[in-house]
Amino acid sequence: KKSSRLFDYDCARNILTVNLLNEKLPFLDEKTFCIIGDGYGSLGCLLKKNFPKSKIIYINLGRTLLFDLHYSKKVFPELDHYLIRSNNQPFSKDFNYVEAELHKNINIKSDIFINNHSMQEMDYEVIKSYFFMIRNQTKDTWFYCCNRISKKLPDGKVINFFKYPWSKEDHLIVNGLCPWAQRFPINMPPFYRDLDGPHQHRLIKVALEK
């Protein structure tokens, strides 16, 4: 209501994601969540609402990051919202915003990383840079990833979920087709439509770099 956004499929998908994390990782209240590519801040706001002591870090393309900021600040105007552009800036205990173009230059520390439906839009070098960040944490770290198994980018490259830089040392907690990411509702019979290709989701305890 505070965000002036109607409840839609994306909202339902985010609720199911948070429910899964809460079920599989029952220790979330004071954790830091880093969301790679939220879009409208809806997942971050949902996490903050359910886990008030949590810290939220958004990483998004510069222009899209403005939407994360706009809607998160609308829902939580009384909390701190910091734009982080260098390692010289302190992180807020509430909401933090990092431009994707700068993420490799900033020492981002998080307990749980989340990526929904945006790694499928990246080339492998960018995906590799995010995995490098995730694997170079200094304490126990988890990563939830839900993306299309295979997608052809405009330049002709095909990005495959199973070719992301996973490790055999990652501990699999959830791994399979995502039940809520195979089809979406429409307002005419049969009242759903298949998404463009199957979507896999995976929750891991990350094998960190030694």
Residue ranges with predicted function:
Residues 1-28:
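Conserved Class I S-adenosyl-L-methionine-dependent methyltransferase catalytic core
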Residues 29-40:
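Conserved class I S-adenosyl-L-methionine
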Residues 113-114:
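A conserved beta-strand element that flanks and buttresses the S-adenosyl-L-methionine
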Residues 121-134:
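A short, conserved alpha-helix within the catalytic core of class I
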Residues 138-151:
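Conserved beta-strand signature within the Rossmann-like core of class I S-adenosyl-L-methionine
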Residues 163-210:
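Rossmann-like AdoMet/SAM-dependent catalytic core
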